[in-house]
């Protein structure tokens, strides 16, 4: 039996290889670089790797081949397993930009008095002498940087995967590092470890559903490739029961990653317990990668059987928006409130997925569902990373002050920080002149054009509900008095280094610019074209 050498188009996938290469080098750094120098080496390596990969993504995007009638640009590479097309590269760019912000937050040390926000010795039991000694000596886990890079590489591969097997491998590559990172908080170790365990257990459960669904779809179509699956669906060559159950089980795995109801229960616990830098990276990156994979799977592999999965998404989108918006109202912790806000935003994004897919079905100047969802992900990513960066600044003697009562009067003591946080919240609420307003307008418009008006009505109502809990926090910061009775000390705002400051500044600038001048990014999403098939 002859072995056939696989063909790898290095010129197309080298940004992805850079990310994985930096992750591998980061592992070697842990073994060969002295502990005292690891922080600088690992942080510089991760930031440089992300920047190089981002530049590479731009260069690859400039040279994409135009296919067919010009609606799609790109190629199917690596023996048909990876689609390097316009949407994939747009998503890669988003992931790398937000990963750069995440890396800067990972590298922040001023807020914790000269050490990072990560545990000094992860293997030490909370409250033991070993943990106290690790804290006293100022130890920290620099392995978080290669873990972040492995997760980033998995996210990029997840969004570009062109067959079910590659999609599953990418899912595991992005998930496993995040499970570890969620349990490495320096403060509130038990809460962090609980979050990591819940995330791992539920994530493993959802991965099992995904893998079983892939097996059923393979049984239906005889192929793992998206194009071949679509041909089998169009020609109705197999058992429809296998197909429908397979679509449902694949959807479980994807809906878990985006935090959609009823697979959202991990979101508030993990967002609250994980180090806030990890939460920021995960909140933006995981949602972007998972929606990229979902769009490609539903539009390319199951595009010929739209009415088999669309009614399911109608129901899930409405439930997700309602549950996220209503439960966020009763939260008393900032990170849990942002977690349920994230659930509601997942519902808004699912509304966009239900929209019109082909530009030929729309009038000139209207956006497709792919363009609308991509733009929404950009606006949400900048707002959520910036918001969590601000959360790291509000602190008391126990570390970050997440309880609402500790945020009372922050607007009078630190008006700039409170104003920036309020601006991010207003963008998430979809207030005009912010990026969030344009993002919601885009996804609601495409869903309405596709006839999903019940979902749009529910989305508008949930947006109104969401304004309540966002404005509630703003009123808390600016118009309520400090409360020190029975609640301990009032939280203060810690001055960050240039790393966190830069992340917040870019988030504010992008949110403002995209709200006032959204055209260039909408055009960029339109120029990305459709998925290659």
Swiss-Prot record:
Q: Which subcellular locations apply to this protein?
A: Cell membrane
Recorded hits in InterPro entries, A to Z, give: NADH-Q_OxRdtase_suN/2, ND/Mrp_TM
* Top-level EC class: translocase
Q: What is this protein called?
A: NADH-quinone oxidoreductase subunit N
- Keyword field contains Cell membrane: yes
Q: What is its EC number?
A: 7.1.1.-
Tell me how this protein assembles.
NDH-1 is composed of 14 different subunits. Subunits NuoA, H, J, K, L, M, N constitute the membrane sector of the complex.
Keyword Cell membrane annotated: yes
**Can you cite an annotated GO cellular component?**
plasma membrane
**Protein purpose:** NDH-1 shuttles electrons from NADH, via FMN and iron-sulfur (Fe-S) centers, to quinones in the respiratory chain. The immediate electron acceptor for the enzyme in this species is believed to be a menaquinone. Couples the redox reaction to proton translocation (for every two electrons transferred, four hydrogen ions are translocated across the cytoplasmic membrane), and thus conserves the redox energy in a proton gradient.
Q: Which NCBIfam families match?
A: NDH_I_N, PRK05777.1-4
Q: Which residues cross the membrane?
A: 13-33, 40-60, 87-107, 141-161, 164-184, 200-220, 243-263, 275-295, 310-330, 337-357, 373-393, 417-437, 451-471, 502-522
Q: How does it sit in the membrane?
A: Multi-pass membrane protein
| Keywords attached to this entry | Cell membrane, Membrane, NAD, Quinone, Translocase, Transmembrane, Transmembrane helix, Transport
Which reaction does this enzyme catalyse, per its entry? Answer: a quinone + NADH + 5 H(+)(in) = a quinol + NAD(+) + 4 H(+)(out)
Identify a single GO molecular function assigned to this protein: NADH:ubiquinone reductase (non-electrogenic) activity
GO-annotated biological processes:
ATP synthesis coupled electron transport
Taxonomically, the superkingdom here is Bacteria
What family is reported?
Belongs to the complex I subunit 2 family.
């Amino acid at each position: 039996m002859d072995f056939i050498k696989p063909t790898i188009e290095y010129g197309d996938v080298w940004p992805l290889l850079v990310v994985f290469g930096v992750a591998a080098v980061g592992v070697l750094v842990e073994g060969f670089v002295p502990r005292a120098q690891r922080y600088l080496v690992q942080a510089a390596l991760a930031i440089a790797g992300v920047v190089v990969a981002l530049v590479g993504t731009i260069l690859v995007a400039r040279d994409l081949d135009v296919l067919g009638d010009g609606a799609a640009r790109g190629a199917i590479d690596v023996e048909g397993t990876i689609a390097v097309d316009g949407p994939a590269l747009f998503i890669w760019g988003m992931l790398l930009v937000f990963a750069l912000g995440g890396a800067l937050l990972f590298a922040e040390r001023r807020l914790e008095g000269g050490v990072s926000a990560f545990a000094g010795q992860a293997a030490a039991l909370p409250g033991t002498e070993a943990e106290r000694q690790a804290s006293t000596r100022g130890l920290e886990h620099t392995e978080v940087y290669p873990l972040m890079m492995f997760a980033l590489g998995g996210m990029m591969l997840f969004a570009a995967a062109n067959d079910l097997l590659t999609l599953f491998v990418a899912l595991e590559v992005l998930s496993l590092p995040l499970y570890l990172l969620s349990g490495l908080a320096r403060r509130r170790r038990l809460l962090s470890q609980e979050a990591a365990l819940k995330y791992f257990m539920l994530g493993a459960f959802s991965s099992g559903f995904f893998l079983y669904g892939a097996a059923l779809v393979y049984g239906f179509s005889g192929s793992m490739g998206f194009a071949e699956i679509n041909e089998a669906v169009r020609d109705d060559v197999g058992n429809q029961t296998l197909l429908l159950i397979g679509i449902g089980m694949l959807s479980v795995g994807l809906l878990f990653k985006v935090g959609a109801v009823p697979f959202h229960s991990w979101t508030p616990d993990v967002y609250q317990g994980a180090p806030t830098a990890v939460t920021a990276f995960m909140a933006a990156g995981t949602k972007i990668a998972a929606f990229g994979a979902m769009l490609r799977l539903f539009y390319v592999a199951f595009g010929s059987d739209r009415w088999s999965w669309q009614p399911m998404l109608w129901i899930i989108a409405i439930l997700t928006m309602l549950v996220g918006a209503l439960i966020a109202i009763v939260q008393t912790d900032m990170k849990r409130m942002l977690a349920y806000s994230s659930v509601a935003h997942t519902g808004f994004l699912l509304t966009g997925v239900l929209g019109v897919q082909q530009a030929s079905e729309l009038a000139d100047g209207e956006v497709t569902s792919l363009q609308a969802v991509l733009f929404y992900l950009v606006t949400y990513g900048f707002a959520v990373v910036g918001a969590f960066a601000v959360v790291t600044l509000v602190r008391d003697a126990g570390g970050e002050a997440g309880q609402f009562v500790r945020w009372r009067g922050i607007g009078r003591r630190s008006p700039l920080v409170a104003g920036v946080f309020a601006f991010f919240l207003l963008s998430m609420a979809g207030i005009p002149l912010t990026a969030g307003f344009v993002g919601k307008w885009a996804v609601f418009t495409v869903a309405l054009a596709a006839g999903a008006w019940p979902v749009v009505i529910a989305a508008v109502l949930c947006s109104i509900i969401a304004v309540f809990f966002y404005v509630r926090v703003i009123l808390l910061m600016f118009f309520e008095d400090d409360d020190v009775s029975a609640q301990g000390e009032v939280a203060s705002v810690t001055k960050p280094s240039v790393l966190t400051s830069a992340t917040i500044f870019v988030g504010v600038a992008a949110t403002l610019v995209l709200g006032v001048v959204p055209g260039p990014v909408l055009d960029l999403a339109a120029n990305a074209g459709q998925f290659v098939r």
